[in-house]
């Protein structure tokens, strides 16, 4: 009887060890991720990637749209599944916003509508091709002092701006900065069938001399990220944050 108990114990331990070994190997090397992200940044500042044509007439609107469709077709052929579309550029945007003016990249005239909604169009075309569209939001830099974005912010929220070198930036230490950026991200999430919000330049300017501790600086940036996260998730919990 003791021999049988001993044999059963050995078999049991061997089974556990084998299972643990298989689990250890297979957990990381053989089980593929549910969905691999293959993403590209689609840059709109200065029309770097798109648009190449300014939209201000029916003909140029269609040409601008076709440029994007051609790009998305190429990305689809390259097996991309996620497009990070630069949506907030430098205190300016590529959709009709209650907070910030139009960027000049779409119409050729800063502050002016191109005659259609580029963000809505991009989302629809991405989804037609089975690709996600994430709004790429440049967070802290807002461009040169005489730019459309800084002028708008100077008029509405001068307390949120600081000048470093030749550029203007939002003040990360201000709670109102976190709220302002969160409002933009909430607006996008509420109004569009967006798949994600992608925060860029979510940091202090590289050339800025901090007069606070690095720990406090990290906390200030974390406050912005958390405020944006909470605002987005309150609207649509499934929208991704990156």
Task: Identify the function of each model-found stretch.
Residues 35-37, 43-66, 124, 134-191:
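Active-site-adjacent "subsite" loops/lids of carbohydrate-active enzymes
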Residues 1-22:
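Bacterial Sec-dependent N-terminal signal peptides
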Residues 93-108, 141-165, 202, 207-216:
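Aromatic- and acidic-residue-enriched segments that line the glycan-binding/catalytic groove
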């Amino acid at each position: 009887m003791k021999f049988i108990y001993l044999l059963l114990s050995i078999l049991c331990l061997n089974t556990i060890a084998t299972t643990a070994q298989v689990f250890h190997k297979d957990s990381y090397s053989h089980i593929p991720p549910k969905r691999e992200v293959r993403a590209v940044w689609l840059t709109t500042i200065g029309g770097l990637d798109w648009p190449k044509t300014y939209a201000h007439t029916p003909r140029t609107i269609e040409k601008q749209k076709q440029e994007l469709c051609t790009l998305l077709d190429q990305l689809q052929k390259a097996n991309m599944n996620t497009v990070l579309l630069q949506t907030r550029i430098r205190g300016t945007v590529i959709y009709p916003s209650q907070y910030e003016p139009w960027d000049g990249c779409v119409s050729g005239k800063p502050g002016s509508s191109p005659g259609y909604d580029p963000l809505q169009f991009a989302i629809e075309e991405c989804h037609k091709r089975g690709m996600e569209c994430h709004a790429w939001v440049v967070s802290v830099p807002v461009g040169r002092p005489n730019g459309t974005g800084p002028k708008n912010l100077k008029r509405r929220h001068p307390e949120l701006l600081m000048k470093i070198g030749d550029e203007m930036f939002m003040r990360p230490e201000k709670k109102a900065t976190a709220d302002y950026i969160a409002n933009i991200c909430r607006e996008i999430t509420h109004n569009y069938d967006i798949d994600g919000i992608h925060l860029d330049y979510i940091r202090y300017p590289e050339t800025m001399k901090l007069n606070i501790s690095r720990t406090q600086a990290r906390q200030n940036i974390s406050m912005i990220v958390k405020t944006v996260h909470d605002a987005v998730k309150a609207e649509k919990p499934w929208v991704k944050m990156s």
